[in-house]
Each structure stands twice: as structure tokens, then as C-alpha cells.
Amino acid sequence: MALMSQAGSSHCIYSEKVRCISGHRSIINNMDMFRMREICFGVDISSRNASRRVQGNYLNHIGVGSRRGDLTIVAASPPTEDAVVAAEPLTKEDLVGYLASGCKSKEKWRIGTEHEKFGFEFGTLRPMKYDQIADLLNGIAERFDWEKVMEGDKIIGLKQGKQSISLEPGGQFELSGAPLETLHQTCAEVNSHLYQVKAVAEEMGIGFLGTGFQPKWGLKDIPIMPKGRYEIIRNYMPKVGSLGLDMMFRTCTVQVNLDFSSEADMIRKFRAGLALQPIATALFANSPFTEGKPNGYLSKRSHIWTDTDNNRAGMLPFVFDDSFGFEQYVDYALDVPMYFVYRKKKYVDCTGLSFRDFMNGKLPPIPGEYPTLNDWENHLTTIFPEVRLKRYLEMRGADGGPWRRLCALPAFWVGILYDEGSLQSVLDMTFDWTAEERDMLRNKVPKSGLKTPFRDGLLMHVAQDVVKLAKEGLERRGFKETGFLNEVAEVVKTGVTPAEKLLELYHGKWGQSVDPIFEELLY
């Protein structure tokens, strides 16, 4: 149901058709889980009893997995029903093995890009209501051959191959892309998606806005999507932070999901990703307005995460400990309070409860039941640090933005994390950064962007070196992908973030109105 209120003057939009090229579907074969574990840990564990148990549980319970390989979870889908009851409780080793199963050899590394966007009515600029979203999803499904994803009698998403379209709590429209080999394929996928969405949405008088935070409307104006898990989370958020509802209903992001070859490779990429995440936040800062006025931040979206739920967000300083590995991340995740479990096609409220208790069959709402690997995978998706580990690594620090930046964000991270030379240079560069310095950057960048003081200069100077490394990494990949960095190259050259350009327009050409942003950042 959409909650509506009277607000300022309307601003009509006349959009242009976006130039598009065909999307690209990529299908990759998953390596056998235990071959993966041998790659990850460098030992042959296939004969161990515990590993046989992992294999049994894994095959029985992994009805959903990650967007990687043959065992695929589609983001739009509710969890699968757990038809198979665990023969014996999961062990911590099983949970570690789940993460380790993501290891894959370099030739199988892929790029998975996700982005969210705000739908709005052209005539009023109001957010799309659920009924409009349902019509849009049905229209895309019928015209472009997507499979509908339902929760009860409500359409909540679409899937096609390894792509999915899903809804965030306030109706933010998300594309979770397929795992692809090159950035050219990634950008083609984005273009194909935007073409399909626009083809249906424009006939309905609907447009889409690429920014990190809803610039005009208050929480009371945002529709609530009919998804069971969101109701549980919405009721819990005010208990653990002051900005959680803003995060749910008024933010949009773009992120990239990248692979690792081994536990050691995961550690190196995790550390580089965390250290550089504030730079990505600055480069893509694009959320300076709240309810029609400047909000004092360049990335309001990033600031919101500092007071959403600090039990499940942040910079994870333990990743830089010498002892860090898959097991330590499992220990961390076990201590993150739960949100829910999915049983009998319903979400069971488990907010604030312990997954460790669940492992022991002592979860109060479902006493005597033990978790499956489905439950573990679902739990991992409710953890929101700046870099998140599942069976791949998610870079989570960037604001949503216009389509060129949807290609630039994966280009930035692929150039750094998928090239050994650039990755090592970043690790050398950030080796002596202290936890206090990383936290300082995390907390100050949302407000001051690239102008944040750092050591003897500004963060802009570090960012210039990092973007240079990303470009060199892309050049060495040999796919002629460096052009996708043009958007961020201009930002580091001038030190002016996208948000600062929007503020300049607001105080100048726009006459202190945010309404023109709906045309400026229209997809």
C-alpha cells in the first residue's frame, strides 16, 4: 500500500529512448564442491568423514545457493521449501565448507553486477505504487519472456536464466545480473535491461531515477512491498538503529560480486576491498538531497549505514587479523543476530535470536529444529558490512547512479581485484593503514568525499593512484575495458564528486528545487 501526502510542485519529464545493445547470457559450469575445497585449502579432504557429511548436507539442502555456477539462487525468489530434514545437525565445519565452496580457478572468475533504481510517476514524481510495479513486472514478463516470481498471489520479481529482477522494501527496482566474463557483457546486460524496463514503463507514465537516496519524498510517502521478510525487518530496525527504515525504503546502490581462487586470495581481496571502500563511496557519491533539500552529505546512503544496525554493518576490523579466514568469518556471522527462518512457505520471526542456538536446536520459535544450509545462506544475506563474504565477495560501498556509472563500478573493482599486480600494489599501499584510519575514512567520506584529509594530503590523491592501478589492471586483462573507467577518471582528476555537481545545479540552474534531478538522472 502506498502512503501518499501532498508535496511541492510537480515537474513533468519527457524521456528519450535509451540506446541499447543486446544483453549477453553467460552460463558457467560449477566445479565440484570438493575440488573447490581442495583448491581453497590446498589439501585433499575428500576422504574425511566430516567432508562426506558436508557433501550430503550440501546436496540435500542447497536448494538455493549463490549466483554462481549450477547451484543458483535468484535474488527475486523467496527461499525454497526445505523438503529434506537434516539427518544430523550442521557443524561449524559445514558452514566453513559452504563459504569455501565458492573458490574457483581464475579462468572461471566472473563479474556479477547488481543495481537498484527508484521508479516514479512522470507527472507527479511520486514513487511507484505496488499495483504499478506489479503491472510493470507482468508487462516485462509477457513482452520479454521472463519467468514470474510470486509470494502467495503477489508478483515480487522476475527471473530469466541467471538474471533476476527483485523489489527492495520501498519498491526500489533491482537487477541482479548474471555472472559474466567481461565488462562489455556487463554493460550490454545493463543496457538490455534498461531498454526492456523503459519499453514497458514509459507506456505507463513511469520513469526510473539513478541516485543513492530518495531526493524528494519522506518515509510516509514510500510504498511498502508485500514481502514477508521485509515486514519482520521493518519492525526490528527501529530497535537497533535510528536510520534503518531510511536504509530499507529510501536508498539505492550499485555493487559488484567477484570471485576468489582460494582462502588466501579471498583474504587479500577482502582486505583490499575494505581499505578502498571509502574511496569507492567518494567516487560514486550521489545522494546529497533529502525531502527536497541538501542533507549535508555527499553520500547520505553511506552515512545511513553507520546507524542502521551496527551488529551487522561496518568495516570488520578482524579481517585484518593474522588469524582471519573462512572460519573467522563464520564465527562473526554466527554472532550476528538473526532476522527470520523460512518454514512452510512463511517467514518465522527470529529477530535478535542466535544462529548458534539454532545450531543446537534451541531456537525458541521452532524448538528442536536444526538449520539447513538454506538457512545459513539466508542468514548470510542479512549481514551488511561494507564488503560481504558469501561464496564470492560483494563490494557494497557505492551509491546508485546513472547507467554509465553502473558499468564504471564493476570496472573499478575488476581492475584492482582481478589483476595480481594491481591487487598487490593496493595491498602494499594500504598495509600500514590503521583500523582507526580506515574507520575515520568510513565515517568522514560520506560528508567530505574526496576532500577528506588523509595523512599528508587529501583522499583525492590516494584515489588518483588507485584509479590508475585499476586502469592498468584492466589493460592487462586484455579486453579493451579501460573506457568504462572514464566516469571515475574525471571525478579523480577534478576531485568533484557527482553529488557536488548536483549541489552546484541545485544552487544554480535548478533554482533550489530538486525536481529537475528526476530528469537529470533519468535512465
UniProtKB/Swiss-Prot annotation:
Pfam families for the chain: GCS2
Please provide one cellular component term from the Gene Ontology annotations of this protein: chloroplast
Q: Describe its PTM?
A: The Cys-187-Cys-407 disulfide bridge is known to modulate the enzyme activity according to the redox status. The oxidized form constitutes the active enzyme.
The catalysed reaction is: L-cysteine + L-glutamate + ATP = gamma-L-glutamyl-L-cysteine + ADP + phosphate + H(+)
Q: What is its EC number?
A: 6.3.2.2
Q: Which GO terms describe its biological process?
A: glutathione biosynthetic process
Among InterPro entries, the record links this protein to: GCL_bact_plant (IPR035434), GCS2 (IPR006336), Gln_synth/guanido_kin_cat_dom (IPR014746), Glut_cys_lig_pln_type (IPR011556)
Q: Where is this protein found?
A: Plastid, Chloroplast
* Disulfide bond positions: C187-C407
Q: Name one GO molecular function term.
A: ATP binding
Q: In which pathway does it act?
A: Sulfur metabolism; glutathione biosynthesis; glutathione from L-cysteine and L-glutamate: step 1/2
Q: Which UniProt keywords apply?
A: ATP-binding, Chloroplast, Disulfide bond, Glutathione biosynthesis, Ligase, Nucleotide-binding, Plastid, Transit peptide
Q: Which domain of life is it from?
A: Eukaryota
* Main subcellular localisation: plastid
* Subunit structure, as described in the record: Homodimer or monomer when oxidized or reduced, respectively.
Could you say which protein family the record assigns here?
Answer: Belongs to the carboxylate-amine ligase family. Glutamate--cysteine ligase type 2 subfamily.
Query: What is this protein called in UniProt?
Result: Glutamate--cysteine ligase, chloroplastic
Species in which this protein is naturally found: Solanum lycopersicum (Tomato)
